[in-house]
């Protein structure tokens, strides 16, 4: 549940401590389930 590389902590997203930057918003990343999915599966995890 710690931030890794360019991905925020999933805990911070769930608890509302993470807020999307202007670049995140422009890319369609906002707080919620979709961001959590990208944190878990969005890198080279698989």
From Swiss-Prot:
EC number of the protein: 3.2.1.14
Record has Repeat as a keyword: no
Cited InterPro entries: Glyco_hydro_19_cat, Lysozyme-like_dom_sf
Catalytic EC class: hydrolase
GO biological process, one term: chitin catabolic process
NADP is among the record's keywords: no
Reactions catalysed: Random endo-hydrolysis of N-acetyl-beta-D-glucosaminide (1->4)-beta-linkages in chitin and chitodextrins
Source organism, top-level taxon: Eukaryota
Family per record: Belongs to the glycosyl hydrolase 19 family. Chitinase class I subfamily.
Identification of the protein by name: Endochitinase 1B
């Amino acid at each position: 549940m710690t931030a890794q590389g360019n991905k925020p902590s999933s805990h911070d997203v769930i608890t509302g401590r993470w807020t999307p930057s202007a670049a995140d918003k422009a890319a369609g990343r906002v707080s919620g389930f979709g961001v959590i999915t990208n944190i878990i599966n969005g890198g080279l995890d698989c």
